[in-house]
Every structure is written in structure tokens, then in C-alpha cells.
Amino acid sequence: FYPVLIGYGLCYMPTLALTNSISFDHMKDPSREFPQIRVLGTIGWIVAGLIVGRLGLEVTAVPLRIAAGASLVLGLFSLSLPHTPPHAAGKPLSARDVLGLDALSLLRDRSFTTFVVGSFLLCIPLQFYYAFTNLFLNESGMGEPASKMTLGQMSEIGFMVLLPWFLFRLGVKRILLIGMAAWAGRYALFAYGDTHDLIWMLYLGILLHGVCYDFFFVTGQIYTDEQAGPRIRAAAQGFLAFLTQGVGYLIGAYVSGAIVKSYTIPAGGHDWRHIWLVPATMAVVVLVVFAVLFRPAVKRET
């Protein structure tokens, strides 16, 4: 099972950056149009969470079967996407092109380097949420946690639709900083909330997902597209995804797993307050350093 899961991940994860590149290639104003397209993926996430939660499928193999079928349908649907030939079509292809090394030229820009490093570092504490929130809510006694977590995606829809307005009013740096602060805030809410009088803190922590995801991930993808331009758009998106959703998530999985294990209670369960304070602190440190060093560069037109 595990080798098959790894194989699936190797096939699927690159499509996250690829779909961004294809989308940006067909847009005249990505900062305005991309959120309207990306929000459909959020709706799909909500549907999946509601199905799993409402039908009580969380501890069964049914979600994996549903995912397998949906992946097959998605693969077939991809054949109907608009024709998007490589910008270097008909030109000699070098090893540098195949490996996407042109994206490394963006690192000459100090602000882009700061953005990439900050995004990579923030993705380490992010894994605490993705890997352990469901377990946390289960151990806290919240019923149907998978369904409750879709509240985060519901808030994501609203913030996704409003993202172009926020970008216009606040700019990339402020939006990214708000997104980073939201991650720290949600972990603090999880640390001190409970399923009794302070249950509102848990719900608020979940609802912050709209700010956490849209203001950090989606804004980062739009910023990367602006800095890269059409020629190295795909390479830049792939480079960002590799460092964040690849290396960052991998390190985050090991770090979060080790922290959660170290706070296991012998009688059963975990010391969640101390667990959540770890990623909260990490996010705050990244936020402060990013605020000092990040200076958005002028948009490129190449």
C-alpha cells in the first residue's frame, strides 16, 4: 500500500504547479481571474469533507476508493483542457530547460529569495494542521470533525472571491503577512480552546483557514507568476511547489510527527496545548523575519 501511495503522490503533486501554470497562461489579469478559478477546487474539497464526515467514512477505506475514482475522472477530463503548448516549442531543448533551472534566476532578486525561503519555512509548521487537526478534534470530543473542518473551506470561498480586492487595497506584502499571522493565530486558538465554554476558539481556528490559505498560498502563486513572466512561468511555479509542498511539507511531516509523539500522554491522548504552541511559535518567528526582509520587487513584463 505505502509504495503505491508514494507512486500516486509522485504523479499527483507535480500537477498542483502545472494547473497553476496552465491557468495563468490563459489569463489576461491573473491577480483578478485566478481566485475565481481556484475557488472551484475549494468547493470540491468541501464536498469531499462533507461526504466523508456525514457518512462516517473517516476510519474506512471508502475515501481512498472515492479518491481513486475521482482521479481517473480528473485524468480523462484533463484531455479536454485548452491547448497549451510550451513557450519553447520548436526550439532546441536543453537539460537546463528540462530541469526548470531557469527559475533559479529569480533568486537574484533578494525579495523573491526572501519570499521563497519564508514560504518554505512556514510550510514546516503548516503540517501540524494538515496532519493532526482531525486527530486533535477527535480527541477533544468534537463530533464529525471532517465535516466541521469544511467550515475552513467555506470561509476560503469568501476570501478567495475577495482576494483581488484585498490585493489591490493592501498589496502583496501585507496580504502575505496577514496570512502568516493567521497561521500563528489559529494554532494559539487550538492551544487554548476546548469543546466546552471555549469551543468558539476551535471554530474560529478552523474558520481562519480562508485567510491562512488564500492570503499565503494563492497570493504567493500570483506573486510568483508576476515575477516570472510567461517564459519561465511553469518552471517558477514548479520550483515554488517543490520547496513548499515538497521539501517543506516533508520536513514538516517529520517535525510535527516527532513533536506530537513527544507529547503523548501515557494514559492515552496528547498534550495538545504544548503541541500547538510549537507551530505557533515557529510561525511567529517566520513572520517577524519576513516582515523585516521582504521588499516586493517591481512586476516583471518578460
Q: Which residues are covered by each model-predicted region?
A:
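Loop-to-transmembrane helix entry
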Residues: 32-42, 62-65, 138-157, 200-201, ...
